[in-house]
From Swiss-Prot:
Gene Ontology CC terms, in alphabetical order: cytosol
Localization terms from the record: Cytoplasm
Domain TrmE-type G: 226-385
Gene: mnmE
Organism: Ligilactobacillus salivarius (strain UCC118)
Chain sites annotated for binding K(+): N236, T255, I257, T260
Keywords in alphabetical order: Cytoplasm, GTP-binding, Hydrolase, Magnesium, Metal-binding, Nucleotide-binding, Potassium, tRNA processing
Any one GO MF annotation of this record: metal ion binding
Protein name, entry field: tRNA modification GTPase MnmE
Entry EC number(s): 3.6.-.-
Keyword tRNA processing: yes
Keyword Nucleotide-binding in annotation: yes
Binding site for (6S)-5-formyl-5,6,7,8-tetrahydrofolate: R28, E90, R129, K464
Main function: Exhibits a very high intrinsic GTPase hydrolysis rate. Involved in the addition of a carboxymethylaminomethyl (cmnm) group at the wobble position (U34) of certain tRNAs, forming tRNA-cmnm(5)s(2)U34.
């Protein structure tokens, strides 16, 4: 279904700031009657007569009782130069649950409707202010875990990904139009050969662009969702100390008693621009303790699901069978092997370790003395962003929906090429080319289903 701007919208209202105590809260209105409704409850200048994009001092009052609720500043922004392209009012009131909710309820009782999650952004999309990739980047920006992920989200919000996708769609549309002309009005005997050549070249060209975009998907997913990182090792080798160092706070219990971490602890941390979802696992060993055994089993699952494994070994002890089992169990994963406790007399046989672990995976540290941890952080950044240090200026694919649609478009282009290779008539190959055009259009929202909008914007917070 193509994008259509609805002819009528009611006026919506919501609190746009997080709930709780704070210096200031913002209550937002959007719609044809936004100014009229706000004016009913505002004591100060007549908001229906003030210039657009002005901030106006006054009080919110209950029109029925004339009771003052709060001293406020009201921003008046008239269509179309607003986020939603509707008239927008933003009431800056004192923070706190009670005054903010009282103002919201007053607006609702005077003609506004409580906005659904993401409805302001949805209206911006439906009015053509932004496309779907830009709408999704709004939430990415809110949820950004590092400076780098924030810059990538801003890049997408600026429309850089949209521009690239639309250029690819235009390339497809141009060749489809030319193919149609050649089929309907052939002027040369070899028109079929020329048309086939044209279709093939464009399918290859667009497919190559899609493949280049998909090469950024892995790093993009890391920036958007965080890198699932399991910290593993046998009990009491320093896993929890490492977690606490990376977090810069004590989240895990650190003692000299083996087996004190009996569950899986998850935390997000920014390491040199890489958002890590750190998982501190219970030490893996044979145990009779029922609770600890459950933690050990969860640890094994965490290793399977992790994008990166940090395997911690104790450099002050000899390599044990449990260490060797963990080295073997994690050998197929992207891995950093950390030789910890180097501040103590070393008993670890390095020749034995190097036989089992490649040299470039090894890092020596003393988390207690804070030595070697900088090299660990450098290693993490090098592993995942060595080739894209300037990722903030790169068009990246960070969204699973976009990745799926790009893969579908690539499959459609493969079908075009396979059809041409097998001698299929050009007009039938056009169908798959058109499918690729549609699938790319779903990324930007140039074509969409209503169910998609409902599902997508329901993930937003109220007031956005």
């Amino acid at each position: 279904m193509a994008t259509m701007v609805p002819t009528e919208f009611d006026t919506i209202a919501a609190i746009s700031t997080p709930p709780g105590e704070g210096a200031i809260s913002i209550v937002r209105l959007s719609g044809e009657d936004a100014v009229k409704i706000a004016n009913k409850v505002f004591k100060g200048k007549n908001l229906e007569k003030v210039p657009t994009h002005t901030i106006n001092y006054g009080h919110i009052v209950n029109p029925k009782t004339n009771e003052e609720l709060d001293e406020v500043m009201v921003s008046v922004m008239l269509a179309p130069r607003t986020f939603t392209r509707e008239d927008v009012i933003e009431i800056n009131c004192h923070g706190g649950i009670v005054p903010t909710n009282q103002i919201l309820q007053l607006l609702l009782s005077n003609g506004a409707r409580l906005a659904e999650p993401g409805e302001f952004t949805k209206r911006a999309f439906l009015h053509g202010r932004i496309d779907l990739t830009q709408a999704e980047s709004v939430m990415d920006l809110i949820r950004a875990k590092t400076d780098r992920s924030m810059k990538v989200a801003l890049n997408q919000l600026d429309g850089n990904l949209s521009h690239l996708i639309r250029n690819l769609r235009q390339d497809i549309l141009d060749v489809l139009a030319q193919v149609e002309v050649n089929i309907d009005y052939p002027e040369y005997d070899d028109v079929e050969t020329l048309t086939t050549k044209m279709l093939r070249e464009k399918a290859i060209e667009v497919k190559k662009s899609i493949q280049q975009l998909l090469t950024t998907a892995k790093q993009g997913k890391v920036l958007r969702e965080g890198l699932a990182t399991a910290i593993v090792g046998r009990p009491n080798v320093g896993k929890s100390s490492l977690l606490n160092h990376l977090l810069h706070e004590d989240k895990a219990i650190v003692t000299d008693i083996a087996g004190t971490t009996r569950d899986v602890i998850e935390e997000y941390v920014n390491v040199r621009g890489v958002p890590l979802k750190l998982i501190d696992t219970a030490g893996i060993r044979e145990t009779e303790d029922k609770v600890e055994r459950i933690g050990v089993e969860r640890s094994r699952k965490a290793i399977e699901q992790a994008d990166l494994v940090m395997l911690v070994l104790n450099a002050s002890e000899e390599l044990t069978d449990e260490d060797k089992e963990l080295i073997q169990a994690t050998s197929g994963k992207k891995r950093i092997v950390i030789l910890n406790k180097t501040d103590l007399p070393q008993k670890l046989n390095m020749d034995e370790v190097r036989e089992l672990v490649p040299e470039d995976e090894l890092i020596t540290t003393s988390v207690l003395k804070k030595t070697g941890v900088d090299k660990l952080e450098e290693k993490i950044a090098e592993l995942f962003f060595g080739g894209i240090e300037n990722s903030q200026s790169t068009i990246m694919v960070t969204n699973a929906r976009h990745i799926a649609l790009l893969n579908q478009a690539e499959d459609s282009l493969d079908a075009v090429l396979q059809g041409l290779d097998s001698g299929m008539p050009v007009d039938l190959c056009q169908i798959d080319m058109t499918n690729a055009w549609d699938e790319l259009g779903e990324i930007t929202g140039d074509s969409y289903q209503d169910e998609l909008l409902t599902q997508l914007f329901s993930q937003f917070c109220l007031g956005k």
